[in-house]
């Protein structure tokens, strides 16, 4: 089937921001102006289309990335129809995984900032994720109608805090209550939106006299940024002193896609001003799937191969999100990088080595859906009923295999025990937890062998609270939840140059014999686990070496200090012996496990605890109290900045163990006037007194 929209007119964009910057409202306005919604949804009354889970509507925050397709012909109807796939991503730190996954499959992003709050901690996290995947982006400064709004302050923060290179393409007319529109620096005209039509109509006018000087100054910066795109344009600019509109747009597009600049706009989504111009900027400056480099992957032999965004290429796609839908069951969201996917096709999953048959294909609009027959290169859609595909896996042509780069998911830092309230809940709970863990790779479920309890782990208290809540609402499982527990780790600080493990059993008939000698060394943080085979002369036969590795790996989940997972250790197998008759895989696994445990004891084992980056915004009067309290929680205060309009931002690194219940405590310390955000930073060695307490508590 021929394309309705050429690939050059596709835009796959994410809308990303700090919590409360007004991102979901911005998305709602996009859906309204592109004609998808005929009634405006508001986050604060729980009617926003993109926030479709019950918890999201109650809490007024976005938890899962909803994917929506919209169409845009330009604010003045002056463009051919463009197809925009929008992914709305959450702004709460506990849901960073959602942002990470959407960044992996997007071509461009709109970063939304609050004109009052500016660049906040989560803005920095999101910016880092966009850098990691090389996503070109625009900046949209929202809430220009709020008291304390300051477009130019946010411009400065983008430069200093994010090391961005923002290029304003509009500047505000008025501020706070008197914000009425923007000066378009490309056209050098004022844009005033009509309030009666909820911003669907607008007028170009002359730039207000009092803004002419400012507009000329920023126009100059805009033209300079455009001229820097090529020597040819720079010469033209130096000769004529200016550039025309087409030159500017082509140059800004080129530099935005290269990641050199970020066009910057402003408005107030809630008051229906500015989002329309931002949509035009999405078309003008953000890439189509054809503008980005071909996607990298590997063939079956591990050789690098590429696929371009072309319908004629062999099919390849990445599954980037799983979701349970109450009506159609399991949905797998896929980004098609090359070729065409049709319902009824059989495709290949190279990670599992399995074939999958494609059932129905759906184009999603928040939680409404439209059935489609095929998905073309560059598009995003949901597949119904894939049996064995998890987040981050590749789907490809059955005869032309490619494995796309997998996504990286963070390790959980907090755990809780969950127990079903009744026998009936017991059976349903296992199913509910495995379904939720399949959807969310940053959520883990395991059984504690000693206590028999089910332990759930995630990225923060809110993350686990919402998952338990979903278990109740979506699966009808009532559960009791234990106190949050810190996800400690264990490692070693010294080498153990030689440690022996010997497993010998003689009980008549065939016995067991395994004998290994290992060397253990600490790895740098984040090194994980490494196994080296340094056997010479066949003292341990080839076929038993994988069993040694496996024996060590099976020991890693429970360390010798307090039974926490062991990380950052290198084990080298360099000697051993075997018996012609009695040796087998199991005997070598047991010997390796014994040697590793003993080696850990000799190599100065230590307990590691998760450290959190905490940022508190507080009125100045309470700054001293807040800092004192953070220090009493074993926190290291790393700095304090002024907030424009009064108040202080305090940055600190604090152990997670000391942060439980902090929200309540901070409220009482500051009479409810301070707010904070917290995200995982790294693991660090726990002080001896803390480690002793944790070890003693686990030993009870």
Swiss-Prot record:
Domain named tr-type G: residues:
8-290
SMART domains, A to Z: EFG_C (SM00838), EFG_IV (SM00889)
Per UniProt, the keywords (alphabetical) are: Cytoplasm, Elongation factor, GTP-binding, Nucleotide-binding, Protein biosynthesis
Where do the coiled-coil regions begin and end?
Answer: none
BP GO annotations:
ribosome disassembly
Instruction: Show the GO MF annotations.
Output: GTP binding; GTPase activity; guanosine tetraphosphate binding; translation elongation factor activity
One GO term describing the cellular component:
cytoplasm
Kindly report the protein's main subcellular placement as a broad class: cytoplasm
Claim: Translocase is one of the keywords in the record:
no
Which superkingdom? Bacteria
Q: List the disulfide bonds.
A: none
Task: Please give the Pfam families that the UniProt record associates with this protein.
Answer: EFG_C, EFG_III, EFG_IV, GTP_EFTU, GTP_EFTU_D2
Locations listed in the record: Cytoplasm
Residues the entry annotates as binding GTP: 17-24, 88-92, 142-145
Q: What is known about what this protein does?
A: Catalyzes the GTP-dependent ribosomal translocation step during translation elongation. During this step, the ribosome changes from the pre-translocational (PRE) to the post-translocational (POST) state as the newly formed A-site-bound peptidyl-tRNA and P-site-bound deacylated tRNA move to the P and E sites, respectively. Catalyzes the coordinated movement of the two tRNA molecules, the mRNA and conformational changes in the ribosome.
The family line of this record is: Belongs to the TRAFAC class translation factor GTPase superfamily. Classic translation factor GTPase family. EF-G/EF-2 subfamily.
Q: What's the protein here called?
A: Elongation factor G
């Amino acid at each position: 089937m021929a394309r309705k929209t050429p690939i050059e007119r596709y835009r796959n964009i994410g809308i990303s921001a700090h919590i409360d910057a007004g991102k979901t409202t911005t998305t709602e306005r996009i859906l309204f102006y592109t004609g998808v919604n005929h009634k405006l949804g508001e986050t604060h009354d729980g009617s926003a289309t993109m926030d479709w889970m019950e918890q999201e509507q109650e809490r007024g925050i976005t938890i899962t990335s909803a994917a929506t397709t919209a169409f845009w012909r330009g604010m003045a109807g002056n463009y051919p129809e463009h197809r925009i796939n929008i992914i709305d991503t959450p702004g709460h730190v506990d849901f960073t995984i959602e942002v990470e996954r959407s960044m992996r499959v997007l071509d461009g992003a709109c970063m939304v900032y609050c004109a009052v709050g500016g660049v906040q901690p989560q803005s920095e996290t999101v910016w880092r994720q966009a850098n990691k995947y090389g996503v070109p982006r625009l900046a949209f400064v929202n809430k220009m109608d709020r008291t304390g709004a300051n477009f130019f302050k946010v411009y400065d923060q983008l430069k200093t805090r994010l090391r961005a290179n923002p290029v304003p393409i509009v500047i505000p007319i008025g501020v706070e209550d008197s914000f009425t529109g923007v000066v378009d620096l490309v056209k050098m005209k004022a844009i005033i939106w009509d309030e009666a039509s909820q911003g669907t109509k607008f007028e170009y006018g002359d730039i207000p006299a009092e803004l002419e000087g400012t507009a000329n100054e920023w126009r100059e910066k805009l033209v300079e940024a455009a001229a820097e795109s090529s020597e040819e344009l720079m010469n033209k600019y130096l000769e004529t002193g200016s550039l025309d509109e087409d030159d500017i747009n082509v140059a800004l597009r080129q530099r935005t896609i290269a990641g050199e600049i970020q066009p910057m706009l402003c408005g107030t989504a809630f008051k229906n001003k500015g989002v329309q111009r931002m949509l035009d900027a999405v078309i003008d400056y953000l890439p189509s799937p054809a503008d980005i480099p071909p996607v990298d992957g590997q063939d079956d032999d591990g050789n690098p191969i590429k696929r371009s965004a072309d319908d004629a290429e062999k099919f390849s796609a990445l599954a980037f999100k799983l979701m349970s839908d109450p009506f159609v069951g399991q949905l797998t969201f896929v980004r098609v990088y090359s070729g065409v996917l049709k319902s009824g096709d059989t495709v290949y999953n190279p990670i599992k080595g399995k074939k999958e048959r494609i059932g129905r294909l759906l184009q999603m609009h928040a939680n409404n859906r439209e059935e489609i027959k095929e998905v073309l290169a560059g598009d995003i859609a949901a597949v119904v009923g894939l049996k064995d595909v998890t987040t981050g896996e590749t789907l490809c042509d059955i005869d032309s295999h490619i494995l796309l780069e997998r996504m990286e998911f963070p390790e959980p830092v907090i755990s809780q025990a969950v127990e079903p309230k009744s026998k009936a809940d017991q059976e349903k709970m296992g199913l509910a937890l495995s379904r939720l863990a399949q959807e969310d790779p940053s959520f883990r479920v395991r059984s504690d062998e000693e206590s028999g309890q089910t332990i759930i782990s995630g990225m923060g208290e809110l993350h686990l609270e919402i998952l338990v809540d979903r278990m109740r609402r979506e699966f009808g499982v009532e559960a009791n939840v234990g106190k949050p527990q810190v996800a400690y780790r264990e490692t070693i600080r010294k080498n153990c140059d030689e440690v022996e493990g010997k497993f010998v059993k003689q009980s008549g008939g065939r016995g067991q014999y395994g004998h290994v000698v290992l060397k253990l060394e600490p790895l740098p943080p984040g090194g994980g686990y490494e196994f080296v085979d340094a056997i010479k002369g066949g003292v341990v036969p080839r076929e038993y070496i994988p069993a040694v590795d496996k024996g060590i790996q099976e020991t890693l989940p429970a360390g010798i200090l307090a039974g926490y997972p062991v990380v950052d250790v290198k084990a080298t197998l360099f000697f051993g012996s075997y018996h012609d008759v009695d040796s087998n895989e199991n005997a070598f696994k047991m010997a390796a496990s014994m040697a590793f445990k003993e080696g850990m004891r000799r190599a100065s084992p230590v307990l590691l605890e998760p450290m959190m980056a905490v940022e508190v915004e507080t009125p100045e009067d309470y700054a001293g109290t807040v800092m004192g309290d953070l220090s009493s929680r074993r926190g290291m205060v790393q700095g304090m900045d002024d907030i424009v309009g009064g108040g202080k931002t305090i940055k600190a690194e604090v152990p997670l163990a000391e942060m439980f219940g902090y929200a309540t405590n901070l409220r009482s310390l500051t009479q409810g006037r301070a707010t904070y955000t917290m995200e995982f930073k790294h693991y660090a060695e726990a002080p001896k007194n803390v480690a002793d307490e944790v070890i003693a508590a686990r030993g009870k």
